[in-house]
Amino acid sequence: MKKLLCIALAIILLVSLLPGCGQKIKEPVTFYYQITNYQENMVSPIAGEEREVTGYRDNLKYLLTFYLMGPISQELSSPLPRGTQLCGISQEGTELTIEISDTASALNDSGFSLACACLSMTCMGLTNAERVTIVSGSRSLTFASDNLLLSDTIAAKETTQ
């Protein structure tokens, strides 16, 4: 009986030491993506995915490049077209501007709004930004933290440059 108990404890110890088994995420961040099979009767088309970023928590360029690689979960999908790249980041106080490649021109207005909402929510969680502007080619969309709602009444301002 002692031998069986020792073997069981050894197995539990080994399993807890395996990556992804029993270990908590040390430096988690939440990236927001589109729910793959979103249906209109659902509350929100956006869901968060927790990711490990040990050592890079304060490196926004790294985090956004990591974000643009897309989600790990099969239940989520990137609302931005494949190949979208980070072109620039600038922050003045609580206003953050993210410039991405012009791949967003392939999206219709609602798709672009959803993509910008996901990226804005991610940025607001990573920084102290209260307003996030996403620029893609000639399109631009600004979200403020106090009026970012995930419903048909998204308070956003789209401009053409």
What is each of the regions a protein language model found here?
Residues 9, 13-17:
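Hydrophobic core
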